[in-house]
């Protein structure tokens, strides 16, 4: 496994960097947040991303995509994360595209995938029912009734849940809470009768929602994958999501580190640049080392996904864990090393 980007992947990364820097600086996201934008992402910006083909990176060419792989979509997310580019790319271009491509029926692929590629359809993955993430704790019920299922229950903290057109829902068709068997994935039209979505205001200003399902009827043709194989399927989908999220968090950490490094080279205290203080140099060096280690971990997980490695689950979990810890370290250190200006929002 070579932990380097191919020429094509590097080109994609460079394109994403230029796009994010020019079309979506951090000030763009702050404006959406401060103006209480209901979507918290820009439709015009999403349209531009669609023209670049980003929602179709994981989708086969037969359905209009480019089939560029997990590495391709991850390097885009990495660059977009550096400027906090607001978009449904993670929930739709990663989770939605991967789920339907790998587990959808031919009819489902033909219907949904071209719409994802064209930017006509956004998706959201609804799995959690409390603040604790554990798919096995699924209690929302999908009860068989003729050729349909009746859905009752709730989902919480659904990313892009307030705006998505299609909900990928994990529900229980048999068994009890805590059991990974008896779970089934469904493709649910977000505008179906009986669905109530409540947008949440979160600290990171991302688009989340709580979703209630009351006697929502969906045909059995809308099962994603096979009946009661949802436990195994969702684990694979989450592995891919972990890699994409790790790449995003790495981008956040890289941007925070670069901003801090620039500040150390400009800010003077006691008549000298604070970057000349050895204690701050040591702290900056630690951040640099952790970021470089995380890069290798994330790259390893991306390549494992594209190569179909049996180590995917382990490497994806490792990448997300390392990225989370590194981002926590760097963001905390960035605030501390900026001093008082580090806790302002302007």
Model-found features: residue ranges?
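Flexible, small-/acidic-enriched active-site or ligand-binding loops
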Residues: 137-139, 189-220
